[in-house]
């Protein structure tokens, strides 16, 4: 049986050393972001059916350094609960949406997950904290190359990036325990359905 979930609303040790003051500031801002995500989950529970997100999902969200996934000029706003521009006419998703879609995916430590639409790489990094392997596809080459560099810098060795049209999936790595699509297609691409394991789960806006 295939479960396709439609959200009701609408990533080696790191080589980037930060001063202790900046680390403290980011930790405080990240904690505030997590509190806002939890509050928004309660506020939207009637629409999503999820008054709270799983502990593992929240722990992953609280660990990933979102400020590394946005341009320098946006770092000050990295832990605000809103999307931000990342260049190439693309955005990094609102943290609440990342948490919601990740929770809907119900990731397990042994899972192999396909992400369609790498973008900044932030969603893939969150998944990498939760599952065994993440395959992610990005059609915008500069974004894909930037994400590859970030994954290397941050030590996400369980993330593999491909440049191309994600709606065709990644047949060589299939089948997948779950698939997450970060942008809404006109219809659910059949190749993605075909590449899900029996009983697999797809989260798609």
Residue ranges and their predicted role:
Residues 18-114, 130, 145, 149-153, ...:
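Class I SAM-dependent transferase core
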Residues 3-14:
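Bacterial N-terminal signal peptides
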């Amino acid at each position: 049986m295939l479960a396709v979930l439609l959200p009701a609303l609408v990533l080696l040790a790191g080589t980037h050393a930060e001063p202790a003051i900046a680390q403290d500031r980011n930790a405080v801002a990240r904690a505030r972001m997590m509190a806002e995500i939890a509050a928004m989950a309660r506020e939207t529970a009637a629409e999503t059916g999820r008054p709270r997100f799983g502990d593992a999902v929240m722990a992953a969200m609280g660990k990933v350094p979102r400020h590394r996934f946005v341009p320098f000029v946006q770092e000050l706003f990295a832990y605000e609960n809103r999307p931000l521009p990342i260049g190439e006419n693309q955005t990094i998703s609102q943290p609440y949406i990342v948490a919601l879609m990740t929770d809907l995916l119900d990731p397990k430590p042994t899972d192999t997950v396909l992400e369609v639409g790498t973008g900044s790489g932030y969603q893939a990094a969150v998944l990498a904290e939760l599952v065994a392997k993440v395959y992610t596809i990005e059609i915008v080459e500069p974004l894909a190359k930037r994400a590859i560099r970030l994954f290397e810098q941050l030590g996400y060795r369980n993330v593999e990036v491909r440049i191309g049209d994600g709606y065709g999936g990644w047949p060589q790595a299939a089948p997948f325990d779950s698939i997450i699509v970060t942008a809404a297609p006109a219809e659910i691409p059949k190749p993605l359905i075909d590449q899900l394991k029996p009983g697999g789960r797809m989260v798609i806006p």
